[in-house]
Regions:
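Acidic/histidine-enriched, beta-strand-rich ligand/metal-binding domains
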Residues: 1-66
Length: 66
């Protein structure tokens, strides 16, 4: 897991082989988003606001599990 400087997101991990993006949120909860393209995972890590990028590009767009 990679720690990110965000008010909403604590850590992020991406497995390119399975296209699974794991996000651990600051206020608890770990979610695994399925079939996330590498460009989206890279975008999350590179974004000036990780929380905004998550909201705009990941939330409600990918199937997830806890």
């Amino acid at each position: 897991m990679i720690h990110v400087d965000s008010a909403a997101i604590d850590e992020v991990a991406y497995d390119a082989a399975s296209r699974r993006l794991t996000i651990r949120f600051v206020h608890g909860g770990r979610y695994i988003y399925l079939d996330v393209p590498p460009r989206v995972a890279r975008g999350l890590l590179a974004a000036p606001s990780h929380g905004r990028y998550f909201h705009d590009h990941i939330r409600d767009r990918y199937v997830f599990r806890h």
